[in-house]
């Protein structure tokens, strides 16, 4: 039995009056007696061998200024047996000891102690307070009456009466008000942990061991305990904080005093972790599906396996059954997803979806993956999804990959890849990419060779196949060794580089339309380049603020001789989009079917403003242009370049005020005196959940998926508090070229403190004649559940700077991540 320290707290009033303790019952062995209040007194422990003792009186305390009694807790004495406690060590407390404090204490230590008046019992981090408290040491039982309050760490339970076996954590609490707090992992990797509190009221709370509670006719919520906006009301409520699971029997979810979700039996997460059970429904609507109702069932099979079974009713389409299975092992992870609609009410056809993603660490050096996706028809996503990012998918990947890392400087991989191409618009068919059956790759990079050289290698063998018979097929072998000599000093660098790009093709048949086309083709192209740059710095001051300004000119020379390539099919090659990412590239084409001839010099200059105290970049401006010394001869189907210089590229980005940022990009054609491309974005974001954005896009020669040429649109978006917990959010994108609205989002959010409600409407046009509309309605109960269809991901993609206004649960609904 833990050692017991008895510390009576006596109160001295005005004029020297004293409150004497109630004497303890007589005992066979005389105990210590209470000394006169005028003499010095030491607080002493009662040794475990003493059957009874009279309580010593505490030293007199100063009276309150008003002459009234001023209670204060005396410091407990040491628990060391057979030794007196001095005032110097009175604050020491032995771990596991039990301390009883009160204004009056009477009784026999080894039988029963009765503490009255501001009574306290403390053992380690447990503190039980009440008007009156009885402690029975033989059974370690505490009985408390009147204003009872139990605190253990951050947990607090209060009520009129309680009984508790302290060591076993068993007992009962009558009519309790309780609040239990636990630490939950951060919302994102690297985020600090946060506190999650749940509490409520009950007729009776039963302690059933450490971290185990059972409550009768109880409520539970993450809102304020005394006035919750939402709560779970249950006939029987079990809270298991070891497994972090709550079980409600005969339960109902109540929101604003209105019952809206009945749970005859349900498990729910106490701190947001995954739990098996029927999940709250997802309700939405779109013009493609009509009423859209989903009632998922989540099955937490094991800590590393789970599944979700998702019946979905669509008013215009019918009943769909979906499922997802996720798994995780020491060396593997993945998920399987399937959807089945037996008969679409509109098309009259069966519609299905299947998806598999698997990742496998086979050995310490060998890694494998599978990514297989497929649907039953071309219109599957457009008809059955309300998300623009999904509805606009056209190529579904199907691939298997093996990667071998031989050492820190070389690796190899094998790939088998194909696509399912969705052609939902017969008037604008999408070209199906070539299959790679297989592709073998080797790469290497070895710096710090003798004389400071760096060696790089790229090798490839790939067999191309196509589902359409009118496309040529064949294989390609590539070997590209390179040597460079990086020379870097303070303030400048120069890197000359030389390589030989060798390619061999073996085609099933020659390219149609060429009289001298070959089926066996070799191409050897030497490539030489020099990259160089200088950095200048100076102290500068703009608008009264000190900066470090840099000036960074860069020159890049590239020489690639012409080689005939017009009889090589375009298996995986197209022209890069011109921009700053490509202006210093070695090849103007993607893939390996074209090596662009070049005798050119790229010149660019960048200037930055850097905060000298923090080193952060405040602003950046850059301009660049490429100059050609020879005419272009190699093409990939595009028109030949005739000018001796490219368009001028210019860009500016930075924080122009404390809360405002600007990002611009300009592509200017000096030959035609035309702007080819211009992008402008402005953001004002003074604080969290306050953001306003303005954007403009212009592209003179961009070819749209529908075949139209040119782009010119403006968009505005933002999120802003409206007052009283209300927030507005929205986005408008208007095509100035076609004078039509291409996308619109309008939403409103309300932050209720422990819950958030969202309503949003979305309209987008996948093409001028096909407009999809969707409505999202969501009620999110913090750290418990999200009910309805969530617009959050849509808004995050569409409104830069959007902030989710509540501290969201890590999981969507009742534990699904």
From Swiss-Prot:
**Which keywords does this Swiss-Prot/TrEMBL entry list?**
Cell outer membrane, Membrane, Signal
Q: Does the keyword Lipoprotein apply?
A: no
**InterPro entries per the record?**
LipoPS_assembly_LptD, LptD, LptD_2, LptD_C
Asked if the Swiss-Prot or TrEMBL record annotates the protein with the keyword Signal, the reply is yes
Which superkingdom heads the taxonomic lineage of this protein's source?
Bacteria
Q: Where is this region: Disordered?
A: 1-101
Gene Ontology cellular component list? cell outer membrane; transporter complex
Q: Where is the composition biased (Low complexity)?
A: 13-90
Concerning Pfam families, the annotation shows: LptD (PF04453), LptD_2 (PF19838)
- Any GO BP: lipopolysaccharide transport
Main location class: membrane
What span is annotated as the signal peptide, if there is one? 1-26
Q: Where in the cell is it found?
A: Cell outer membrane
UniProt xrefs under PANTHER family: LPS-ASSEMBLY PROTEIN, LPS-ASSEMBLY PROTEIN LPTD
Family to which this protein belongs: Belongs to the LptD family.
Question: Could you describe the subunit structure of this protein?
Answer: Component of the lipopolysaccharide transport and assembly complex. Interacts with LptE and LptA.
What does the function comment of this entry state?
Together with LptE, is involved in the assembly of lipopolysaccharide (LPS) at the surface of the outer membrane.
User: Per its UniProt record, what HAMAP family does this chain match?
Assistant: LPS_assembly_LptD
Q: What is this protein called?
A: LPS-assembly protein LptD
* Organism this protein belongs to: Azoarcus sp. (strain BH72)
This protein's gene is called lptD
